[in-house]
Amino acid sequence: MDSWAVHPSYERLVDLNGGPSSAVIFGERGSGKSALRRSVAKGLKADGKSLTVEVTDVDPWLEIFKLQAGQSKQRANGFARLDRADLIDLMLSAATMRLGESLKAEPSRLKKLSSSQRAELCLLVAAYHANFEGDREEQVSHLLSASRPWWKSVGRAIFAVLGAAGCLVPLVQLGGRVSIEPSATLPVALVGAGMLGLMAAHSLWRTLMARRAMGRIAAEMRITAPDRRLMRRALTVLPRGSAPVLTQGEETREEGRYRLLQGLIQLVRDMGWSGLELLVDRIDESTLLQARVDCMGSFIDPVLEHKLLQLDGLGLKLFLPVELTPLVRGAGPERLRRMRLDKATLVDELRWSGQELLELADRRLVAASNGPATCLGELLGEDLDLVEMKDALHTLGTPRLAFAFLRDLFEDHARELPDDLHRDSDGWRVSRGAFERQRAASSDRARTLRRMMRQTSVMRGTVES
């Protein structure tokens, strides 16, 4: 990937020679977090070693949580009750949906799993697929057909045919079409009826057990909404040992979610991937979190935990708004020990140098130019040095602020140009006067914006302390 296209931290986030790794990236709006996330995802997908999952819209899951909790949308920070188990559920949901898409494109990977592993995967998909695209039933049905051993279906069919045949013996005897010893007619019919009754009793017992397991599973899920009918169907059809995959009585919710996440990662590995890469971005664009620091903090804080960030086979990459930096900078000793971000990649502020922003600007000029390729330096007047332009861009530090400054600069300069200016005149070049005016105005706006963000962050830290 070209060096100009992404932030220098790209190389720290994409280690194609190692396994999945976690990272926490803070940046203000317009700093290029989403562009960096897209570049990281593109690099990981091109490498193909890991299953890459992007979560850029958390509202569908948060809406489920609000409904499950019975909270009104007007309640202040209705997400304070989110815990780590809920957020691992969200990860499992996003991962199972992405895995279903990947298996559609590469169905051969499913053949690498044993029948018991396919049954485990089927239950995970039935429980965690959020059905945002309406394809949950199709995926569960496909996995059910692939998870049930063919010999069991054949054996069940033969058992049913033999039972039905035994029950029909008296009718056949009365019709006189087949000669059967009268003394054997009743025992054969009773055996046939017993076989059918046994099948019916077994089916009823499996259905009741499935309903019981389904109720226990659904009661623990607050951020996903499993389809009860599909879950009962899966629990009824799959082997009896499959149900404990989802719930075990002796463990807490959080322990159970860690076990399920580790189980999914192992399934992913057994299908040929090195692990799971999960990229979370744009939480400040959530309509439910409303870009409120307290709501976003309630959503992210449970995830900043050493056990989760360092989970083997999981690369959790969080692209977070800079307002949440007090979660790290203002953390006390106990919280720092819990997070252990020294063992993960941490970008505490996504900033760009003047040279990097200049390269981005030059690339935009090339893309927008109909004539010969040009660069920003060629548009500056003789009294204006390129070093000064780099310094101005460096002070702004983000693509959004830098490009806003350049836009205002060219607009200001264009307003001063005379109508009769000759095409070949040097007057077209940006003057120092326009540069100084817009540099001062842009610097003031940037300082005001960052001061407001710092105040918001301080308020967050004060409330938490």
Region spans (language model):
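Hydrophobic anchor at the beta1->P-loop junction of P-loop NTPases
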Residues: 25
